[in-house]
Amino acid sequence: MSAEVIKCKAAVAWEAGKPVSIEEVEVAPPKAHEVRIKIIATAVCHTDAYTLSGADPEGSFPVILGHEGAGIVESVGEGVTKLKAGDTVIPLYIPQCGECKFCLNPQTNLCQKIRTTQGKGLMPDGTSRFTCKGKTILHYMGTSTFSEYTVVADISVAKIDPLAPLDKVCLLGCGVSTGYGAAVNTAKVEPGSTCAIFGLGGVGLAVIMGCKVAGASRIIGVDINKDKFAKAKEFGASECINPQDFSKPIQEVLIEMTDGGVDYSFECIGNVKVMRAALEACHKGWGVSVVVGVAASGEEIATRPFQLVTGRTWKGTAFGGWKSVESIPKLVSEYMSKKIKVDEFVTHSLSFDQINEAFELMHAGKSIRTVVKL
């Protein structure tokens, strides 16, 4: 246990719409049932950019963003029994307390134990562990991985194989796990099935990987950026199509291509019009469409009820349906045994001082995932 305040570098988002700023921050020691982690590597995700843009209704400033990280436990607070200094870990934005009604229900991974305070950018006791220039800095998604040291609740930490390369497995903290789980947990893709994936960014590629692992026989990638097609095929897409190449709605194109529609579709963008197209591209009688992308606040989805009456199912998923603390170590093991890909998602690697470039690469569509080494 450490009672010392640590001074370190962090990328602070002082206000919406402005680049993050590398600052010296003070990180208080962990309180009861908290863990202080030295972050070794973190990736930059669209969700971080969404909050930084000011569009996130839960977004508050100043804040230390980041939720796709990995590191080493530096110290633990009182009452922490399952973790110790030196453990290799991934911080989790969806915790797993193991006690709430959500954790006790096998149908969901949405632990609610600390949801209220986490949504306000605070630790479970309602306070922050970060200060900078005399000001309180908020936490983000219970993780705040854009800091050399962070403090998280002990129920928001997965202990992983110490041999795992942290600049790769940090991606299992969000995007790769989300897409992979959408296919294998939420949709439960069956061998021999036909799948369509809308949006071929990091999450969409992870869905393709999940469909491939599950044994799908035909995997169709859909994106308006044809530069993404080659990578999608590397991950297992059998073909890719660009909606802009057709004069008719993309759902009609897919229905014609697949003799009535796909068995499973996945929307990995966060666009409500595409969510509708993904549902309507599903086969009558049994097609399942999974919403993976996060739409902007206030958006609503629409379709004709007849689409559902005639046997299509609309589902949603968060973090791929994985119960986090117990599942992430298993996903790391699957990666270490080469059952799933992770390295192939990393297109760029930058130093901490270059973190704003990671956002620029993402906005320009030039990266899948950029890993920042701290």
From Swiss-Prot:
Site, as annotated: Important for FDH activity and activation by fatty acids: R115
UniProtKB keywords: Acetylation, Cytoplasm, Lipid metabolism, Metal-binding, NAD, Oxidoreductase, Phosphoprotein, Zinc
Assigned EC number: 1.1.1.1, 1.1.1.-, 1.1.1.284
GO cellular component: cytosol
Self-association and partners: Homodimer.
Positions carrying N6-succinyllysine: K233, K315
Homology family: Belongs to the zinc-containing alcohol dehydrogenase family. Class-III subfamily.
Function: Catalyzes the oxidation of long-chain primary alcohols and the oxidation of S-(hydroxymethyl) glutathione. Also oxidizes long chain omega-hydroxy fatty acids, such as 20-HETE, producing both the intermediate aldehyde, 20-oxoarachidonate and the end product, a dicarboxylic acid, (5Z,8Z,11Z,14Z)-eicosatetraenedioate. Class-III ADH is remarkably ineffective in oxidizing ethanol. Required for clearance of cellular formaldehyde, a cytotoxic and carcinogenic metabolite that induces DNA damage.
Catalytic activity: a primary alcohol + NAD(+) = an aldehyde + NADH + H(+); a secondary alcohol + NAD(+) = a ketone + NADH + H(+); S-(hydroxymethyl)glutathione + NADP(+) = S-formylglutathione + NADPH + H(+); S-(hydroxymethyl)glutathione + NAD(+) = S-formylglutathione + NADH + H(+)
Binding site for Zn(2+) 2: C97, C100, C103, C111
Cofactor: Zn(2+)
Subcellular location as annotated: Cytoplasm
Protein name from the UniProt record: Alcohol dehydrogenase class-3
